[in-house]
């Protein structure tokens, strides 16, 4: 899964929309950042999944000191997930270094540490849904619930430059309807420009399968036939 990260330059500000880690690749292929961290004013986070947040501690490690805006549930989830990701980075670096020592190779450092993750969490600001927030003159945002994950959101952004206001929408990952616990996605009725997630956009999704029935069938089938 690709790491999501978009740079928005508007109203004299530079904001990242998400800062994710590319999953399924070697951790050291994730290290280059697409921007100079010290030149970013802030980050807007759509949701807590690592492909949308996994490089935030690396951003902080390399000099980012702005604010990170997310919904309150996303902030709470990131507190767990970013620390967990950092533990993995440290463990993998330790494992690589044991192999490197035996091979006489140069040691490696983790992409980031638990300390970096904790520093990143200090920059988070938990926001409410459906509340407009002025980040700077001419730059207003609002988080909208989209039912993908606890705290997940689309982000509406109003940019006013030279007396003209333009509305942007960053969809984030959008969930399905009629899910237990998670609310249905909120419909956004208008926008001048929409930046849409499309990781699975070329696939046809049929009705949600009966997972409980499938598990029960598997449980009954395996002991008798060892085949599914």
Model segments located where?
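Gly-rich Lys/Arg/Thr-decorated short loops/hinges at beta-loop-alpha junctions or inter-strand turns
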Residues: 191-203
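Beta-sheet entry/capping signal
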Residues: 5, 14, 66-68, 165-168, ...
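Charged helix-capping and loop-helix junction motifs
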Residues: 209-215
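Catalytic core of the metallo-beta-lactamase
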Residues: 4, 10, 126-186
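Conserved small/polar residues in nucleotide/adenosyl-binding loops
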Residues: 218-224
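Pre-active-site segment of Zn-dependent metallo-hydrolases
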Residues: 10-66, 70-124, 174-185, 211
């Amino acid at each position: 899964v690709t790491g999501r990260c978009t740079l928005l330059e508007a109203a004299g500000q530079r904001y990242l929309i998400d800062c994710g880690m590319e999953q399924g690749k070697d951790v050291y292929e994730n290290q280059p950042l697409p921007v100079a961290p010290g030149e970013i004013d802030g980050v807007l986070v759509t949701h807590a999944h690592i492909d949308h947040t996994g490089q935030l501690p690396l951003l902080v490690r390399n000099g980012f000191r702005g604010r990170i805006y997310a919904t309150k549930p996303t902030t709470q989830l990131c507190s767990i997930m970013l620390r967990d990701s950092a533990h993995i980075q440290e463990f993998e670096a330790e494992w690589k270094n044991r192999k490197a020592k035996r091979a006489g190779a140069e040691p490696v450092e983790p992409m980031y540490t638990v300390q970096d993750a904790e520093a990143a969490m200090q920059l988070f600001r938990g926001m409410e849904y459906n509340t407009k927030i002025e980040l700077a003159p001419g730059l207003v945002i609002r988080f909208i619930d989209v039912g993908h994950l606890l705290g997940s959101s689309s982000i509406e952004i109003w940019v006013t430059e030279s007396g003209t206001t333009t509305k942007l929408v960053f969809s984030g990952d959008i969930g399905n309807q009629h899910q237990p616990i998670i609310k249905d996605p909120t419909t956004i009725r208008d926008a001048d420009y929409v930046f849409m997630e499309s990781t699975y956009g070329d696939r046809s999704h049929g009705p949600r399968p009966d997972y409980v029935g499938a598990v029960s069938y598997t449980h009954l089938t395996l002991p008798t036939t060892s085949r599914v």
